[in-house]
A protein has these predicted regions:
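Acidic, proline-/serine-/threonine-rich low-complexity intrinsically disordered repeat tracts
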Residues: 255-277
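Prokaryotic Sec-type signal peptides and long signal-anchor helices
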Residues: 7, 207, 290-291
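OB-fold ssDNA-binding interfaces and closely related basic DNA-contact patches used
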Residues: 1-170
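Charge-rich, solvent-exposed alpha-helical interaction surfaces
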Residues: 17-20, 239, 243, 286
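Short acidic, low-complexity intrinsically disordered linear motifs used
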Residues: 275-295
Length: 295
């Protein structure tokens, strides 16, 4: 726009400026909450309690899905919060970078790899039987994200360790069992060790009309492992470079490959959801939205 145009249109831009300001304000207050996902409420001490019923898969599908993601802040001040392509059996640039860092033989590089390692998540449908801190959730079907500790408890129900224990499918309407989620704060992290299954019983007293009503509310789990919902390798590598900076990624990708080519690549163990503090989890949930807006 020329100076003459600016002069001629003086005063007429105020409405555009007001609209832009209002748009900015509204974007700052918009919700980042996915109402489909149930999250436990904890008190000031970090303790919480709820009773859940794990629900079966829809149309004969497995009742849970597993995926990995990465969540870390780079030296640029930007966040990298993206699903890992390893969730769908593909090579992921962060995984490649972490392997190179780990193989560099430099301890500080290993520390970087640890802070950037994968986070493991499971997702399933649950019916909230009891939620004392948020009773409005009771009687509703939600998606529930959890980590390895809770998954191990589910697996142990289906594959008991001792011969005198009967296997229980916790996802079964008629022969499953309620799950008593007990959360404690142990050294700043959420601990689920006290959580346990109740004795097996028929869900909702086995009333078929109610069971069918719950079944019809099941959320689709395939979105979490649908390749269409994952960025491409090149898109992720571009984002990674932006977050870590050109120098950081360039240095890591030029480790002496001729020396390391035939060396075994040690796996960097994924961090589970339980190994994150509740504050870290909430922070990453918020910044994941901001990270997407930066792209």
């Amino acid at each position: 726009m020329s100076f003459e145009t600016l002069k001629r249109n003086r005063g007429s831009n105020i409405n555009k400026i007001i609209e832009a300001a209002q748009s900015t304000n509204s974007s700052e207050t918009k919700s980042y909450v996915d109402d489909r996902i149930w999250k436990p409420t904890v008190d000031k001490a970090g303790n919480g309690y709820a009773v859940l019923r794990f629900l079966p898969g829809k149309d004969g599908e497995i009742p849970f899905v597993r995926y990995w993601d990465h969540g870390f802040k780079g030296p640029t001040g930007l966040w990298y919060i993206e699903n890992s392509l390893t969730s769908i059996g593909q090579t992921d640039p962060v995984g490649e970078l972490n392997s190179r860092l780990w193989n560099s033989g430099i301890e500080s590089d290993k520390d970087k790899a640890r802070t950037q390692k994968r986070r493991l998540h499971y997702v399933t449908n649950v019916y909230v039987v009891s939620d004392p801190s948020a009773p409005q959730n009771e009687g509703k079907v939600f998606l529930y994200k959890f980590g390895k500790k809770i998954f191990d408890k589910i697996y142990d129900q289906m594959n008991p360790e001792f011969a005198d224990e009967t296997p229980v499918d916790p996802f079964d309407f008629w022969e499953g069992a309620n799950f008593k989620l007990k959360i404690r704060n142990v050294e700043g992290y959420r601990n689920y060790d006290k959580s346990e299954f109740a004795s097996p019983d028929q869900f909702l007293a086995g009333e078929e009309a109610k069971l069918e009503g719950v079944y019809n509310q099941l959320h689709d789990l395939t979105e979490f492992t649908n390749p269409k919902n994952y960025k491409t390798y090149d898109e992720l590598k571009t984002k990674l470079t932006k977050v870590l900076g050109e120098t950081a990624t360039a240095g890591a990708y030029t480790v002496k490959e001729e020396v390391k080519l035939n060396d075994p690549v040690p796996a960097v163990e994924p961090v589970t959801a339980e190994e994150m503090s509740s504050e870290d989890e909430d922070t990453l949930s918020y910044f994941s939205k901001l990270a997407k807006e930066d792209t």
